[in-house]
C-alpha cells in the first residue's frame, strides 16, 4: 500500500501555493499548474513538478497524464467559469478525488453539482475557526 499520494494543484495564488507546499513537505508527490510563468517558477522549488499550462484545456491535462493522480485540487477561486471548466476536465479525465476552492456558496453548489468531492471556502472556514477560538479560548485549537 502506498504511503504517499499524488496531487495535482491547479492555480498558484496564495491558497494553491500554500496547499501545494504543505502537501509536498508532508512527503507527497505534487504537480502544480498555472498560466502565470512567474508563479510556476516561484513554486518549482517547493513541489515535485511545476508546469505552465491551462487546466481549461483538456488535451493539455491529458498530455500531462493527470489521470494518474490520486487527487486534483482546483485552487482557482476567483473565476467561476475557469474553476468550472478545470473541475469538469479533471472529472472527465478520471481523477478519483477532486477538491475545489470556491469564493461563495453559489460557486460551491455549482462545483459540487459538477462532481467535486469537497469544496472549501477558505475565508469562511478560517473566519469560523477564528470565531470559535476567540469565543472558547480554553478549547484545544485542534477541535
List each language-model region with its residue ranges.
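Cytosolic regulatory regions of ion transport systems
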Residues: 1-143
Amino acid at each position: 500500500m502506498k504511503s504517499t499520494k499524488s496531487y495535482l494543484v491547479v492555480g498558484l495564488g496564495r491558497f494553491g501555493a500554500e496547499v501545494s507546499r504543505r502537501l509536498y513537505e508532508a512527503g507527497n508527490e505534487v504537480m502544480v499548474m498555472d498560466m502565470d510563468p512567474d508563479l510556476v517558477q516561484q513554486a518549482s522549488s517547493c513541489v515535485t513538478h511545476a508546469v505552465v499550462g491551462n487546466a481549461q484545456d483538456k488535451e493539455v491535462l491529458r498530455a500531462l497524464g493527470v489521470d494518474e493522480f490520486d487527487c486534483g485540487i482546483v485552487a482557482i477561486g476567483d473565476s467561476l467559469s475557469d474553476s468550472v471548466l478545470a473541475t469538469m476536465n479533471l472529472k472527465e479525465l478520471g481523477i478519483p478525488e477532486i477538491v475545489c476552492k470556491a469564493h461563495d456558496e453559489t460557486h460551491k453548489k455549482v462545483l459540487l453539482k459538477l462532481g467535486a468531492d469537497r469544496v472549501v471556502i477558505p475565508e469562511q472556514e478560517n473566519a469560523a475557526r477564528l470565531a470559535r477560538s476567540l469565543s472558547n479560548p480554553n478549547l484545544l485549537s485542534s477541535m
